């Protein structure tokens, strides 16, 4: 066994394949390219799990909020999709790889990390558009898939930082810079590798 820091990361499918993303979140191929280049350069193995929205409703779907996905059928669908990626995580950890994190998509009702208060649409259900001034006491939840993934990792005592990539933010935005700082801190905890 090598003493090198061998790393893996769990990543939402749309960050590798932007075509899976619902249209309002945009495709942003340059951002996916930048993320994949960084992970490959740092020799981080990528475990990509299937997009639960695409596999449940296809590519031509309307944007929805977390409320619509929060049901027993969709949660079960997510659990099924995570079976193989979780087996891979277990096998890598068993073989002394370090799980450096999970990367989800900001404002995703399934893979996001911070789903707060959202506007209500004309059907009186939650829309994918966040409220500009949320109530201070409004709970912030994870997206459905991220929540289930967190539960599965916790069951086994595996901790991994959950990061959220702000795909709609400009490259120089504070949110985007904070994402990169967090990712680098988790991938390179001992400083720049030689």
Language model segments and positions:
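Short amphipathic alpha-helices and their capping/turn segments at secondary-structure boundaries
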Residues: 1-4, 31-45, 84-100
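Residues lining hydrophobic/aromatic ligand-binding pockets adjacent to catalytic sites
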Residues: 2-7, 18-30, 114, 118-121, ...
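A structural signal for short, well-ordered beta-strand segments and their strand-loop junctions
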Residues: 10, 46-50, 98-105, 161-166
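Extended cationic-aromatic binding surfaces that line active-site or macromolecule-binding grooves
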Residues: 14
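Short catalytic/ligand-binding loop motif for oxyanion handling, primarily in non-cytosolic enzymes
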Residues: 18-19, 56-58, 108-114, 171-174
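Short, surface-exposed acidic-centric catalytic microdomains
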Residues: 27-69
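Divalent-metal-activated hydrolytic enzyme cores
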Residues: 59-67, 71-94, 127-194
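Internal, conserved structured core segments that host functional sites
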Residues: 98-122, 134, 148-149
């Amino acid at each position: 066994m090598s003493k090198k820091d061998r790393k893996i990361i769990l990543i939402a499918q749309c960050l590798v394949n932007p075509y899976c993303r619902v249209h309002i979140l945009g495709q942003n191929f340059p951002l996916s390219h930048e993320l994949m280049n960084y992970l490959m350069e740092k020799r981080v193995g990528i475990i990509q799990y299937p997009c639960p929205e695409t596999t449940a409703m296809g590519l031509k779907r309307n944007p929805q909020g977390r409320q619509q996905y929060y049901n027993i059928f969709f949660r079960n669908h997510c659990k099924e999709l995570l079976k193989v990626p979780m087996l891979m995580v277990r096998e890598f950890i068993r073989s002394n790889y370090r799980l450096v994190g999970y990367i989800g998509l900001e404002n995703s009702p399934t893979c996001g990390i911070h789903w707060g208060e959202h506007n209500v649409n004309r059907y009186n259900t939650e829309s994918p558009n966040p409220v500009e001034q949320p109530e201070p006491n409004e709970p912030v939840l994870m997206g459905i898939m991220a929540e289930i993934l967190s539960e599965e990792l916790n069951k086994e005592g595996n901790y991994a930082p959950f990061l959220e990539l702000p795909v709609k933010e400009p490259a120089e935005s504070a949110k985007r810079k904070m994402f990169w700082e967090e990712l680098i801190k988790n991938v390179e905890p001992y400083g720049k590798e030689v």
